[in-house]
Amino acid sequence: MASSESRYSPTSLEPKWQQRWQEMGLDQTPEPSAERAENFYALSMFPYPSGNLHMGHVRNYVITDVIARLMRLKGKRVLHPMGWDAFGLPAENAAIERGVDPADWTDRNIAQMREQLQRLGLSIDWSREVATCHSDYYRWTQWLFLQFLNADLAYRKEATVNWDPIDQTVLANEQVDADGRSWRSGALAEKRKLRQWFLKITAVADELLDDLEQLKGWPERVRTMQANWIGRSSGATLRFAIEADGKQAIEVFTTRPDTVFGVSYVVLAPEHDLVDQLTSADQRQAVEAFRQSLQSISEQDRVADDRPKRGVATGGTVQHPFTGQAVPVWIADYVLPDYGTGAVMGVPAHDSRDFAFAKQYDLPITTVVVEPGQAPDSGEPSEAFTGLGELVGSADFDGLQGEEAKTAIIQAAEQRGVGAAKITFRLRDWLISRQRYWGCPIPVIHCDDCGVVPVPESDLPVELPRDVDLSGSGGSPLERATEWKQVRCPKCGKPATRETDTMDTFMCSSWYYLRYTDANNDSAAFTNASIDAWMPVDQYVGGVEHAILHLLYSRFFTKVLQQRNLVSCSEPFQKLLTQGMVQGVTYRNPKTRKYIAPSAVSDPNQPTDPDDGEALEVFFEKMSKSKYNGVDPGAVVDRYGADTARMFILFKAPPEKDLEWDDADVEGQFRFLQRIWRLCDGAKASGLQLQSPLPLPAELTPAETDLRRAVHTAIEAVSDDLQGDELQFNTAVSELMKLSNAMAGQLEAVSTAVAQEAVRSLLLLLAPFAPHLADELWEQLQGSGSIHQQRWPEVDASALVRDTITVVLQVKGKVRGNLEVPAAISKDELEQVALASDVAQKWLEGNAPKRVIVVPGKLVNLVP
């Protein structure tokens, strides 16, 4: 029996191994191989340094760590770095609310979270740590901005922003609540136009869409989300001339030029430049009132499908491009200024949204497309016909169908000079300006004589000034940093001013994976050699909430940098795993809608509100402080150890599914690790050592054959689970449990060589999952070096060969028993064995079956 000194005690052994690994430099990135296939880049999406890890973080980073550890065991040279997405609004808010410096607040949080991550036993190369708020990082973010500027992919233009009329400052979208009010002053936010910086992501829209086909290692839903966001549409632009002068025109884009003869109105975005010109005197007041009513409504709400569409007539008209007839012009909330041309043609008979709008405002509905061979109904239709069909009421184009009709009308529009074929995208250029302090400064200078002048690369970084007043009003806090703002123009030397906007934090996170490849380089953001060695990232892990923006912007950066010969890859991430959320049990009073903390629930089986006795609703939701359903990772590590936390996170659910936290299952994983401890403790007591592999006996006993089969079945299954197209950590842990059960009580019944192979294999398979325990047991059993310096076990195919197999016996499709038969049995022989079995005789009652269905090696089904 094991002594008390040999009890499994993770609280003592885990810190020991974390220190040992650090001293050994075990997690340091080795020099990459010249062969890219020999290198492996494992990466988690880096976190915002809030100061506290949550279980979602743990799941993300443990998944990546298992992959990194596996690849090291398989002989790969692994890059597994970590850093901090450290700019952003929370630090600025903390500075205002608590009177602390954002840099100090952020650095304290980073130190705290780094320690929390290290307690999880993650094999991270901390020598490559980056923080986007440190000038040695954002120097290169600024350098990259200048690359975009030099390539004419960065520009300034007027854009609509949220404006706080009390604080006299611009608000980010996240600073405006659901009612359209400022988060600070409570004032109703207004819309204003300001000159803003943009990156021209639309310049590579085709590549971003087409190259999604290359990303076979990405979840299909993520690729679909990106494709929909990019939203490529083929159609035509058509010009509706303004009757007043005949020179100006409203240009609309449509995917259905075949419906142009059904146009009964044109709709402009309320912000369109031509609205004032087209608005008649008697409609001006109504138009202005409508515009004002949109000030507090977000663009998302304006275009939401479930929201009634509102509009108002301008009183102006335009000329139909084919008939010359006057078409009334309206403005409506569902047309956005920055989408397409900011104008659409209304064809209510053939567009559901236009149909609803026309019905609401009593506008004409004219059918011009019908099912082939069908005459149009008399009177107005009861609903829009949105499919392709045969043209009617379309002058010379009557009788044309579908794509042929579209092509003919586009050609006619081009010949008349009133339109052209066009491809458009839903994707809009990326607005990167932020009127905030805690962000990367935009490295340009404004000169009255020279205009916008890039900061010379030799002057980078443009560092954020310290001791800036963050609580005042009147635009960006950097506007008030007078000494910092006032500079000399790099071109002419005259007085000039710095750009006071900072960059969207996505700018910093769109290239950090490149910096990790050469993180300590003081003279370049990265090098061709470092990119060629490590990029693209082999396995990227992060939440699906980043499916569009972060992942799309990262792809954009990579494509632009490839075009400028700065990187060799066209895509940043080869494989992507989007892990599910971690959910906690949640208690809520159905009457008051108040959430109740689990500690206040006296009986979890029949939970009631301690205040009013109301029976509580019980369900699982994403962990959050407001719902009292969070679990502190530190507390779990304190009680059970990091290895148990890791095992639970990996075992509880497939990685892409949501995981429901269960304390009982955590306890179950702790007991499983204790069983492995006892198993190896018993092997140690019997004198087993792992120092050098012993030769297997020439002849194996049945017990040895069975144990070796269990060992190599586990090696094959775990290897497949960790390297297949779909990573299945949960089933891999199940295989470890099966193997440990097969080994229990059998090590004493087999030769030392077979026992050694079994224990060695079990610990190597366990190592990526429970790295501390695996290394401790490896050391206790005299293994050489660290277990994480060994090689992943290979499957011995001969060990999997069975002399007999188990075949399922069914009668009328229902399982009635099993047959143990020779593995080499023929189909006819298997049928005869089945018919002669006691099970068959019992269920057939001595009668011959009408049919016998034999699936060799699998089953026999007798049909009476």
Swiss-Prot record:
Reaction catalysis annotation: tRNA(Leu) + L-leucine + ATP = L-leucyl-tRNA(Leu) + AMP + diphosphate
E.C. no: 6.1.1.4
Transmembrane segments: none
Positions occupied by motif 'HIGH' region: 47-57
Main location: cytoplasm
GO biological process: leucyl-tRNA aminoacylation
Single GO MF descriptor: leucine-tRNA ligase activity
GO cellular component annotations of the record: cytosol
Comp. bias intervals (Basic and acidic residues): 299-309
Ubl conjugation keyword on record: no
Residues annotated to bind ATP: 625
Gene3D superfamilies reported in the protein's UniProt record: HUPs, Isoleucyl-tRNA Synthetase, Domain 1, Valyl/Leucyl/Isoleucyl-tRNA synthetase, editing domain
Keywords per UniProt: Aminoacyl-tRNA synthetase, ATP-binding, Cytoplasm, Ligase, Nucleotide-binding, Protein biosynthesis
Subcellular location: Cytoplasm
Motif stretch ('KMSKS' region): 622-626
Chain positions covered by the region annotation Disordered: 298-317
Superkingdom of the organism of origin: Bacteria
Family: Belongs to the class-I aminoacyl-tRNA synthetase family.
Protein name, entry field: Leucine--tRNA ligase
Organism: Synechococcus sp. (strain RCC307)
